[in-house]
Amino acid sequence: MYEGPVQDLIDELGKLPGVGPKSAQRIAFHLLQVEPPEIDRLQAALQKVRDGVQFCVVCGTVSDGELCRICADPRRDRTMICVVEEPKDVQAIERTREFRGRYHVLGGALDPLSGVGPDQLRIRELLARIGNQDDGVDVAEVIIATDPNTEGEATATYLVRMLRDFPGLTVTRLASGLPMGGDLEFADELTLGRALSGRRAL
């Protein structure tokens, strides 16, 4: 244990996802050794994120305005919605350049053991988008792109049940090829692109 502010910094860094005690200590001592202007830039970036970043009112991904750039782009195909768990998954699919529709971010996956049920996710908002037409356009296809793990599969199964009531709606799932138990964000562009183009109907 270190004293005072140093230990406070290590403790706060250790709360970040994927940062263990040793990594937190390394980052803390790196920050102690860099020049003050670099610390100022980091502090300014954190302040901008806290004050200026919000969630898109339509799809739920991160945005610097009410609408994200994807939802605001009239060239995107409004008949297709790709459902993902987190904003980072939007970026993973965008890197493939295979998808030209819009997204819907659930904000997680079903996980009863952690207290995450349908009411904690943005499922109602998804159903409303489809039922009310997305910007006046009928949604023809919903692509379920949840992670290929237990929680992601449970979420996909639940969504299929909810979406069956919409006549004429095609519901598809990313094709196999993604490693089971993995996260979408870690899949390479080629694998994810093939999974998207080879998606299967449910």
UniProtKB/Swiss-Prot annotation:
Entry-linked InterPro entries: DNA_Rcmb_RecR, Rcmb_RecR, Rcmb_RecR_Znf, TOPRIM_dom, TOPRIM_RecR
Q: Which Gene3D superfamilies match?
A: 3.30.60.80, 3.40.1360.10, 6.10.250.240, RecR Domain 1
Keywords for this protein = DNA damage, DNA recombination, DNA repair, Metal-binding, Zinc, Zinc-finger
- Annotated disulfide bonds: none
The record's SUPFAM superfamilies line, in alphabetical order, gives: Recombination protein RecR
- Positions of the zinc fingers (C4-type)? 56-71
Q: Which Pfam families match?
A: RecR_C (PF21175), RecR_HhH (PF21176), RecR_ZnF (PF02132), Toprim_4 (PF13662)
Task: Provide the GO biological process annotations.
Answer: DNA recombination; DNA repair
Domain Toprim intervals:
79-179
Entry's Gene Ontology molecular function annotations: DNA binding; zinc ion binding
| Functional summary from the UniProt entry | May play a role in DNA repair. It seems to be involved in an RecBC-independent recombinational process of DNA repair. It may act with RecF and RecO.
The UniProt family comment states: Belongs to the RecR family.
HAMAP family named in the record: RecR
* Protein name according to UniProt: Recombination protein RecR
